[in-house]
Amino acid sequence: MNPTLAGKTKLVDWIARLAAAAIMGQTLFFKFSAAPEAVALFEKLGVEPWGRLATGGFELLAVVLLLVNRTASLGGLLTLGLMGGAVMSHLTVLGIEVEGDGGALFVMAIVTLVAGAITTWLHRAELPIVGARLETQA
């Protein structure tokens, strides 16, 4: 973990990381078990089954990276990419509300995107290649 994180910042960091990991983690069962809801969603996107399984694999990797202090920056970055794709899918193909969920999937994607952004920002100095430059500009 970034040694400069202290007090409330460290708490915000852990809340963001745990929230993102919990939200992505709870969807893994549905993706890997081919739950009808997940299959229907990825069929609508035109990427069933490979898109569902690849997304599940990358989300599992993001969860692990988020929960390990040394890799939190990469987990946050991967979360940003995954949830950016999820939000764009909702805005362009799926719609805000999917199968009568009242927009719950969309809201969870937004919350996870924000949590990933917070994590990435707080751990920006640890990002490979660009981290040192980002830290000096902040």
What role is predicted for each listed range?
Residues 37, 43, 48, 59, ...:
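Glutamate identity and glutamate-enriched acidic tracts
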Residues 1-27, 70-138:
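Extended, low-polarity transmembrane helix blocks
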Residues 22, 26-53:
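Solvent-exposed, well-ordered loop and adjacent helix/strand elements within mature globular domains
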Residues 30, 36-37, 53, 62-65, ...:
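Membrane-helix exit/interface motif
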Residues 26, 47-64, 80-81:
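Core segments of alpha-helical transmembrane spans in multipass integral membrane proteins
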